[in-house]
Amino acid sequence: MHAAGRTLTSAFPRPRAPVWLVVPWAMATSAPVAAEQVTLPDVVVSASRNEQRRFDAPAAIDSIPVDPFTATSPLVSLSELTLTSPGIAVRDRQNYSQDLQIAVRGFGSRSTFGVRGVRLFVDGIPATMPDGQGQASTFDLANASRIEVLRGPFAQMYGNASGGVVQVFTPDPPKTGFTGRASTGFGSDGQWQAGVSLAGGNDRLGGTLDAWTYQTDGYRDHSAAKRYQLNAKIVAQPSTATKITGQFNYFNQPLAEDPLGLTRAQADANPRQAIAAATQFNTGKDVEQTQAGVVVEHQLTDLDSLNFRLYGGGRQLTQRLGFSGAAPSSAGGIVDLDRTYGGGALSWTRKTTANGLPLQWTAGLEVNGMRDARHGYVNDNGQQGALRRDETDEAADYGAYAQFNWTVHPAWEIVGGLRASMVRLRIDDHYVTAASPDDSGTSTYRNLSPVLGVVWHAMETLNVYANLGRGFETPTLTEVAYGPNGVGANLGLQASTSRQGEIGVKWESDGQRIDAALFDADSHSEIVPLSNNNGRTVYQNVDGVRRRGLELGWHGAFGPARRLAAGLAYTYLDAYFGDAFVNAQGATVAAGNRLPGTARHSFGAELTYKPWGQWMVGVEAKADSKVYADDLNTQAAPGYFIFNLKTGYTFKAGATQWYVFGRIDNVADRHYIGSVIVNEANGRYYEPAPGRRFFVGLRASM
C-alpha cells in the first residue's frame, strides 16, 4: 500500500498574516449534503430545547441527515457524517481502544482518550459522564435519523464541558405496519459489518429493535477490533397529550487492540507498524456497557408542557497500557474499571405571548452521578500482575437552568438563558503505602453560566444573530487523581472558564443554503499537563487560551428533480496560548504558541449526482492544514488533501427494496497523519491514517 520512506507533505502554506481582522462573530452552519438525498432536515431542538426550524434557531447549529439504508459507508464512526459541517473536527484514529477525537471550535482537541469539552447525547440521554468525559463509540449510527451539532455560547446551557453539543437522534417506530432492514458489507483491512433492524407499531404503541456487528483486522499492526450492539426503543402514546419513550442499549467490544502512537520517523518509514511495546504488553481494551432510560413528554395545557427523563447503566472495562507499571509509586499498567451511573431531569416549557408576540421559556433541573470501582495492576507482559491501585471514584453533576425566546418585534427576537451548575468529584483511595500515598479527597466546582443573544429576521430568506455567553469545564476524575510532589489528589486544580461570543448569518433560497459566522472564546485556567512520572500525570491550570475563527458552509441542490447536490464547509481556527507557562518537561511554552490538536484551516466538500433515480455517484474531498502535537510546537503533523469516490444503486425485487453501494477512500493513496496524541509523554505523537481502501455493501428493506 505504501512505499517505505515516503515523506509527509503539507497541503497548506503557512499564512503570512492572521486572517482574523474583525470583531468576533459566529455562525449556524449549513447541514452537510446527504449523499443520497437532496432534502435536509429542518427541525432542531438543541438550541432552545424545543422544536424549531434550523434556519430560525438563534445559534450555530447543524442538523445532519442520516439514512441508514442509502448511506455509502458502514456507519461505524461519526467522522463518516461530518464532512460538510464546519466548526466540528472528528478524527478517526483507527484505534478502537481510544475512541474518536471530537473537537468543536477547538474545545476537546487536547483529549488523548475519549471525548472532553464536548457534551454528547443520544435521544436526550447523556453519553457524557458528570466529570465531563464522554464516549462516542457507543453511538448507534446504523439506526440514527439525524445528528445535531450545536456550537457557541448556547452550548453552555448544557453545563460542564459544553464547548459544543452533539446529539444523535434515532427514529420512532412507524404508526402503522411493520418494516425490516438488513445490511452487510466488507472492505479493506478485514472490515466486515452486518446488521438487522425491525420496527412496527400502531397509533398507541410501537417499537424498534436493531442488532449490529463490526469487525476489522485494523489498518495498522495490532489494531484489530470487534464490536456488537443491540438497541431497543419502545414508544407508547396512552393519550394525545402524553408520549413515553423507553430505551435499552447494549454495547460490547471484546477486542480493541491499541497499536500506540509512532514517532515521526516511524510514521514515515512504515505507517502500518505498531511499536514493540504494543505486542509486549498486549495493549488494548475490552469494554461492555448496558444502559436503559425513559423519557416522558406530557402536554399539560395548550401552553404548557413537561419533559422528564430517567436513565441508568453500567460499564465494565479492562485496559492494558503500554508499560508494566511495576514501580511501587506507579498506578499500574492494567486498568480494571467497574462503573455504575445514572441520572434524571425535569423541564417545564411555556409558550405564551407578550404584547401580542410570542414568548417561550423553559426551566429545568438535572442531576447525574457516577461511581467507579477502579483498580490498577502491574502489566506483566499482557497478564495481570500485582495490585498497584484500588480506588472508589465518584462524580455528581447538579444543574438548574432557564431559557427564553422572546419576539419583541416581528423582525426581532431576544434569546437568553442562565444555568447554575455544581460538580463534585470524590476519590477514596484504598491502596496506601509508603511509595503510594493517600490520594483521597473531594473537589467541588460551582459555576453560573449566562447566555444572551439577539436574532434579526432581516428577510424571509435571511437571518442574522449574535450571542454572548460564559461557560466552564471541570477537571475529570483522571485529571485530579494525582497531586504535585506525589502527595494526595490534585484538589487545587481549578475548573476552566470561558467567555464566548459569536455573530452569524443564515441564508436560504431556492434549494440553496449559506451560513457564515465568526466566533471568539477566551479561556482561563485551561487544564494542561504539569508532570508525568510512572504513569501518574499531574495537571495544572494556565490562563489566556484563545480560540477564534470563521466558519463557512454552503449547500445546494440543482437541476431537474434536484439530481445534482453539493456542499462544502470551511473552518478557520486561530487557537493559541495567550500566556507563557512551564510544561511537563520543565520547558517554557511561549505565549502565542498554537493549541496542539487544532488545524488552522479545515475544508470538506461533497458532490453527488443522480443520472437517473436509482443510481448515485459522488466525490468527497477533505483537507486539513498542519496540526501541532505538543505545547512547545516542536512536533507537527503536516497538512493533507484527500478525495474519495462513492456510488450506490437502488432496485426493487418483489416487495423488497435493495441497495448496493461501494466507495474508495483516499483514492490517490496519500500517506498522511490522521490524528495526533497531544503531548504524548514518550514523543510518539502520530497516528497514521489508512492509504487507499475500499468498502462495498448490500442492504435490503421491506
Which residues are covered by each model-predicted region?
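Conserved C-terminal beta-signal and adjacent last beta-strands/turns
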Residues: V22, H222, V235-P238, N249, ...
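N-terminal periplasmic accessory domains that precede
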Residues: L78-L81, Q101-R105, V118-F121, Q135-S137, ...
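Short acidic/polar hinge/loop motifs at secondary-structure boundaries
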Residues: S109, G117-V118, I125-R151
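Transmembrane beta-barrel wall of Gram-negative outer-membrane proteins
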Residues: T179, F186-Q215, R220-D258, G284-Q299, ...
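Face-selective signature of the C-terminal outer-membrane beta-barrel domain
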Residues: A241-F251, D286-V432, I514-D515, R563-G567, ...
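Structural signature of Gram-negative outer-membrane beta-barrels, strongest in the C-terminal barrel
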Residues: F248, A354-N368, E391-D522
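Membrane-embedded beta-barrel scaffold of Gram-negative outer-membrane proteins
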Residues: E297, S305-L321, H457, N463-G469, ...
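Gram-negative outer-membrane beta-barrel transporters
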Residues: W348-T349, I414, M422-V423, R513, ...
